[in-house]
Amino acid sequence: MSIRLSINALYAAVMARRKQPPKDLTGIRQRGGTYQIRVSAGYDPVTGRQLMLSDSADTEDAAVLIRDRLREQVRDNTTARTNVTLGYLLDEWLSGHQVEETTRDSYRLLINGFIRPALGNTPLAQLCRQGPRPFEQLYAELRTCRRRCHGRAFVEHRTPRPHTCDERCAGHVCKPLAVSSVRQCHAVLSGALSAAKRWGWITLNPLDAAQRPRMPAPQPDPPSAEEAAKIANAAWEQDADWGTFVWLTFVTGARRGELVGLAWEHADLVSGLLTIRRSLVRRNGTTILKDTKTHQMRVIKLDQDTIMILSQHRERAEQRCADLDTTLDDDTFVFSYAPDHRRHCDPDAITHRYAKMAADLGIDTHLHALRHYSATELLAGGVDLRTVAGRLGHAGGGATTLKVYAAWLAGADTKAADLIASRLPRPPSVRGERS
């Protein structure tokens, strides 16, 4: 009886095995004690080579599960479609990105200085699998140390070229990268990865879920009225041309490059109008003239004192040209080191000269703070936000001005409140108190 049951059980087991379909082991092969898995993910649009997803497992059943998961990723388009690196993508994106050359140079500095050393050799496929984590980690490291030293001690040499070390070659001290620069790194990466998605190189942008560093609230620090008076007096004492430049910076709030690039044809001393239509910037060691920061010209009305100061400045320039038996043409620069005013001033030299003058006065400030001074004085004086934004050259109809100088609007609001109240009859209960 027991023998008959054993034969029946064996027969049932054999028949059950025959009814089971053979296991699909496509893409799986056994090598030694492990199973290797390879799944085709199409062809690389950049190199034209076939893309393969690979993995390994210790058992056949685990290999089948992994193979099916890789197939699902290919089917759902959640894998990168190219094996190129992030560095290659950044180069391709930057070469065709439509921006001004000065902006392109700043992007290139960010890429070569901070992004490429950290993630440049990482394949896009790996970054897509890891999601936003590598990028957020990079941002955190840069906010701790711009050199990403990870606590490693080393000497920061004064130049990468062969040299003899002196006191300028000192031990590394961690300096965080500014939040604005880290946010620019994020913008560069986001732009490049968005382009990769448009080009079909990747199907998901890992930065879509990344959290970029928060921008701290602007903290403009203009000089006080007393400090401004000291600065203006010191500039006039040095020489009249330098005093004119500092004065014009005070009253117009123009950017450094805008004043350095100013030509006489832009200064209408009869109508008292100053036209800002270009800016002088430094690029690759040379200076070039370009559009203003917002790519918009603006016209600033000048007061009578400023018209007189600029007229005297022009008379001095005309006299210098007369000494050279030439005339002062309208296309020459308003501020120049050359007697004929054909050569502009060095913007960096102006910044250094101003910094030294302020330091000699014991004032901790910088040239751009004069722009803040102009804005805050206008707002505190009750000038409307749109007018201030127009004089400063802020885009957005005053949104930027409001964001930067919000703290100074309280004074203007107080004056507005007093103005309205002064034009209304007071109730009898307070007439006597304020009489």
PLM region spans:
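C-terminal secondary-structure termini that scaffold catalytic or DNA-interacting sites
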Residues: 1-18, 79, 233, 237, ...
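Short, Lys/Arg-enriched alpha-helical recognition elements, typified by the DNA-recognition helix
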Residues: 66, 80-197, 209-211, 331-334, ...
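Short, polar N-cap/turn motifs at the start of nucleic acid-interacting alpha helices
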Residues: 266-273, 364, 383-406
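Short, Arg/Lys-rich segments that mark the N-terminal edge of DNA/RNA- and chromatin-recognition modules
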Residues: 1-56, 105, 155, 271-273, ...
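Active-site/catalytic core of tyrosine-dependent DNA strand-transfer enzymes
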Residues: 109, 152, 157, 162-168, ...
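Basic, Lys/Arg- and aromatic-enriched nucleic-acid-binding interface segment
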Residues: 149-187, 198, 202-262, 270, ...
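Short, basic (Lys/Arg/His-rich) helix/loop patches that form interaction surfaces
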Residues: 148, 233-243, 252, 300, ...
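N-terminal DNA-binding module of tyrosine recombinases/phage integrases
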Residues: 29-137, 313-336, 340, 410, ...
